């Protein structure tokens, strides 16, 4: 599990801040909720699988 407050990079090189964790009600899949700081979705919130995320700083 990636800690809330961690700075992450996705597989495209975009950077985001982890703000929460979320488990899908029906599938039970775990997601990391982030606020994008760079890239195409700056300022937006997104729920991501952790597979393609790299922790830059905790």
Regions found by a protein language model. Give the residues of each.
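Short beta-strand-centered aromatic/proline hotspots
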Residues: 14-24
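Short acidic/glycine-enriched loop/turn segments that link adjacent beta-strands
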Residues: 26-28
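Intrinsically disordered, low-complexity, charged/polar segments
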Residues: 31, 36-58
């Amino acid at each position: 599990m990636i800690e809330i407050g961690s700075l992450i990079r996705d597989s495209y090189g975009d950077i985001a801040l982890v703000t929460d964790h979320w488990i899908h009600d029906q599938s039970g899949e775990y997601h990391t909720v982030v606020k994008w700081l760079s890239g195409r979705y700056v300022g937006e919130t997104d729920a991501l699988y952790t597979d393609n995320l790299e922790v830059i700083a905790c």
